[in-house]
Regions:
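Rossmann-like dinucleotide-binding cores of NAD(P)H-dependent redox enzymes
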Residues: 1-9, 76-77, 82-86, 92-163, ...
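Glycine/serine-rich phosphate-binding loop and adjoining beta1-alpha1 elements at the start
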Residues: 10, 26-29, 33-36, 40-68
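A conserved short coil-to-beta-strand element within the FAD-binding core of flavoproteins
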Residues: 18-32, 58, 142-155
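Acidic/polar residues in short coil/turn loops that connect beta-strands
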Residues: 28, 38, 154, 163, ...
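Core beta-strand elements of the Rossmann-like FAD/NAD(P) dinucleotide-binding domain
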Residues: 38-48, 162-171, 209
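Conserved N-terminal Rossmann-fold NAD(P)-binding element of oxidoreductases
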Residues: 51, 88-89
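FAD-site-proximal beta/loop scaffold in flavoenzymes
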Residues: 66-82, 166-223
Length: 223
């Protein structure tokens, strides 16, 4: 990851792209207010503005991110391989992490609320994955409704359910999808609209309700 960041930084310099480290929020007249990482702020204005703040992992109430509870973002920063991992969410990303950590030697449990993992896939395809996971000794718990979690004296985390026995693990990975990250876009004084699911509303050319302001990527609802 660090290598990719350095590579992209070098690429922006070679293309003479100016970048700011901070959080930008859109104001009226295509003005972006930037709260920079060093505590200062600055404003810039563009003839056209593109909103591309992406998405963030969804979380569950009662599972604060930090320490042994992490999302697909934090798990990439692990410096050691956990002995026991519980993955909440049996979708594509959750299954990818399950397979990877099982191959690395972790004891893995997938926790899925639906009747089967990979609920959006053809059952025949999902069954192939289930059989493969059985060979890797990955435990799959479907129809499991998570109730909460608690820290144990030995530092492990116990996950409880409304049905069934608890699961004890060293790391919990939340993998229940992502949501658009429009939280800090500002938008005061603009005609940019956000729908009830958090997506920025755009037309077929990705233009928002504000002229010459566009939104792209995970920030908009795509087929």
């Amino acid at each position: 990851v660090e290598g990719l960041v350095k590579g992209l930084t070098g690429l922006t310099k070679s293309k003479k792209v100016t970048y700011f480290l901070g959080t930008g929020s859109l104001e009226a007249n295509r003005t972006v207010n930037i709260a920079q990482a060093d505590g200062t702020s600055t404003k810039i204005q563009g003839a056209k503005v593109i909103l591309a703040s992406g998405s963030v992992p969804r979380t569950i109430k009662g599972f604060p991110i930090g320490g042994s509870i992490m999302t697909s973002d934090e798990v990439l920063m692990l410096s050691t391989i956990p002995k026991r991992i519980a993955i909440i969410g049996g979708g594509a990303i959750g299954c990818e992490f399950a397979s990877t950590f099982a191959d690395l030697g972790s004891t893995v449990t997938i926790i899925e609320g639906a009747p089967k993992i990979l609920p959006g896939l053809d059952p025949d395809v999902a069954n192939v994955v289930v059989k493969t996971f059985a060979k890797k000794q990955i435990t799959i718990r479907t129809g499991a409704v998570v109730a909460g979690q608690s820290k144990q004296p030995d530092g492990s985390t116990q996950i409880t359910f409304t049905n069934g026995d608890p699961v004890v693990c060293d790391v919990v990975i939340m993998s229940i999808g992502r949501r658009p990250f429009a939280d800090e876009l500002g938008l005061k004084g603009t005609a940019v609209k956000v729908d009830d699911r958090g997506f920025v509303v755009v037309d077929n050319l990705c233009q928002t309700g504000e002229p010459n302001v566009y939104a792209i990527g995970d920030l908009i609802n795509t087929p």
